[in-house]
């Protein structure tokens, strides 16, 4: 009944209108799991390889028919006949079939599609929601949403250097109430931008993307939107940043072109320290470039005791790279993107290493998304306590938020909303 009998792939579109991969895994008993693979705009140089066709004419070379062929060819050969409930064996079989360190031969997108679809088929067989199948009886913590409601950098066509400005609803009793606060702040920000005559267009992740004079101005707008919504800044709602600093790191300096400034690493760290003194910032992701480990050591020494420092491009959901960071004492949290590593098994291994080492983990979407809601279930399955999946706008973002509402409802009184407690313990002890 649990034997895999077929694996199918197809090319679909993501939220940016680019092709991506969807995979179905079918069992002998007729259970079907379907999963769609996301894609990023700002990517770490050590991420597992996303296989694209590279043909100049078709979709500008971004087609995924090669990945589809690999799903239905070598990867199907590797897993057909296997037990769909043996996730680790399935994933290891695909890793062995690929035979490369970065999954560049068959494609991390192809492998991830099979990995996630198999998990969904197994959950269907077990008659369990995905979060319960993956996490077991202990899965009960709803994640705090880090909602990107102002976009810049690679996610928007504006002059703002930092990529994401997020509101974080920490002072609420339930996920439902926290999400309501995010939606109300988003609406207040929309009205505020209109009053100021600032463009109301939105970026890839649903946040507004106005031209602003500085990153500080963006935080000022968020502050006013929070206060207009009737919430207490610093108590009920805090901020998180994702500068995506690798995107503006050139020649050993941080080029804040929107502000007309060029900073060395020490000055960049000073800049963050100043912002954290002016605003209730509890998390900074990729504040330094992924290859500026000296800069990461500096910011970890200066802010690591009171601010969550998240490695995204720095760690790329890779346990080997994370282990190096732990040994050097840099960052205190990891962003988890399943397509950075390419299988569910390796994702769990990375998160387990993080938690055992005192690092928190924030489960994340990508800028190129679909209506697939796997990451919502994943966040609850591992009791991550944090999720980043964009603004409360655009269907592919709202799909994840709404899935979490359903999960909270299904958990009933067992559901826990951790608030500030989800963020790095060392930060709170500092």
From Swiss-Prot:
Pathway: Carbohydrate degradation; glycolysis; pyruvate from D-glyceraldehyde 3-phosphate: step 4/5. (2R)-2-phosphoglycerate binds at residues 163, 337, 366-367, 388. It comes from the Bacteria. Its EC number is 4.2.1.11. The keyword Secreted applies. GO terms for molecular function: magnesium ion binding; phosphopyruvate hydratase activity. Signal peptide: none annotated. It is found in: Cytoplasm; Secreted; Cell surface. GO terms for cellular component: cell surface; extracellular region; phosphopyruvate hydratase complex. It catalyses: (2R)-2-phosphoglycerate = phosphoenolpyruvate + H2O. Its cofactor is Mg(2+). SUPFAM superfamilies: Enolase C-terminal domain-like, Enolase N-terminal domain-like. It is an enzyme of class 4 (lyase). The active site is at residues 205, 337. Pfam families: Enolase_C (PF00113), Enolase_N (PF03952). Binds a second Mg(2+) ion via substrate during catalysis. Mg(2+) binds at residues 242, 285, 312. Keywords: Cytoplasm, Glycolysis, Lyase, Magnesium, Metal-binding, Secreted. GO terms for biological process: glycolytic process. Belongs to the enolase family. Catalyzes the reversible conversion of 2-phosphoglycerate (2-PG) into phosphoenolpyruvate (PEP). It is essential for the degradation of carbohydrates via glycolysis. This is Enolase.
